[in-house]
Amino acid sequence: MTVNEFYKQKFGRKVYKISLDAGCTCPNRDGTKSYSGCIFCGQNGSGDFIPFQENIRLQVENAKKIVENKIKNGKYIAYFQNFTNTYGDIEILYEKWNQALSCEDIAGIAIGTRPDCIDSQVLEKLSILSEKTFVQLELGLQTSSDKTGFLINRQFFSSEYLKAVSILKKNVPRVHVVTHIIFGLPFEDEKQMLSSVKFAIDAKTDGIKIASLYVLKNTVLEKMYLEKKFSLLSREKYFSIVEKALKIIPENVVIHRLTGDGPKSQTIAPLWIFDKKQNLSIINEILKNK
């Protein structure tokens, strides 16, 4: 099931995600686990497109204006995307989540975080929220390989992801859990990439996001790439692996994304990720034959 089909089924109309910035940091950046972050992560985390503003309601309204021509009579998911959005003062975070939910036409909330940042306080707030609205929690697994996890400076074990999904399923069953996976991480072969997908499926993730690795300026990954320590996936190879991945993803797991990109001005490679028309055409063909 595609995410558009899932949202249409749940809300009865078109739903568009708008990205917000809660001003969070990450235990992999503030010194709790590391100061450098994951080797592929830009200075603004995954929210490179989001201009930071303290006022959440203002962020929502500005984001809606950007996409309002694309969505008629639709609703929005408020997506707290940047860095680790369950890491910090939970009362402050909870207030920001509710500020977004109080805005007009917001159908639910999506929260991006790490598997090692789900504690009892977070579970309590997620439980309260999920009783009154749709809640989507997005976990950045990236790979099931701890060897690769160490290389990319992920700073958590894959077993911590399994534990996180388990406690989410047990304590907040209404929450829709989405798992992020990256294809093309340094030195991973096709078998490992597909193993990461199966790992998430076996953990009972509700949804999955897959993207090809891209290199941003001023990252450790950029240095590795320029020194030719690894190769990036070609478009053909990437979508070949995606097609195989879709064969092992069951129908009840929602496919939230099959490609992704960073800010063009900050991206070194691969440039094919910006050819969205061609990429979407390939994705539609793959899904049609699934």
Model-predicted regions and their roles:
Residues 60-64, 94-98, 123-127, 162-166, ...:
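Generic structural signal for well-ordered alpha-helices
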